[in-house]
UniProtKB/Swiss-Prot annotation:
A Pfam family of this chain: Toxin_20
UniProt keyword annotation of Disulfide bond present: yes
Task of the protein: Inhibits voltage-gated calcium channels (Cav) in rat cerebellar granule cells. Has insecticidal activity to crickets (Acheta domesticus). Is not toxic to mice.
S-S pairs: C4-C25, C8-C31, C17-C36
Summary of the tissues where the protein is detected: Expressed by the venom gland.
Family: Belongs to the neurotoxin 12 (Hwtx-2) family. 06 (TXP1) subfamily.
GO terms assigned for molecular function: calcium channel regulator activity; toxin activity
GO cellular component: extracellular region
Compartment(s) of residence: Secreted
Source species: Brachypelma albiceps (Mexican golden redrump tarantula)
Amino-acid biosynthesis recorded as keyword: no
Protein name as it appears in the record: Omega-theraphotoxin-Ba1a
Main subcellular localisation: secreted
Annotated keywords: Calcium channel impairing toxin, Disulfide bond, Ion channel impairing toxin, Neurotoxin, Secreted, Toxin, Voltage-gated calcium channel impairing toxin
Length: 39
């Protein structure tokens, strides 16, 4: 599980890659330089 370096507010497919208040990305997303990437 990869942690987000930056808080990711960008939403893709209607879902945030990092839910507010969470420290890690969920749902197969990870944050990279404030971009949501599906892994």
């Amino acid at each position: 599980i990869l942690e987000c370096v930056f808080s990711c507010d960008i939403k893709k497919e209607g879902k945030p890659c990092k839910p507010k208040g969470e420290k890690k990305c969920t749902g197969g997303w990870r944050c990279k330089i404030k971009l949501c990437l599906k892994i």
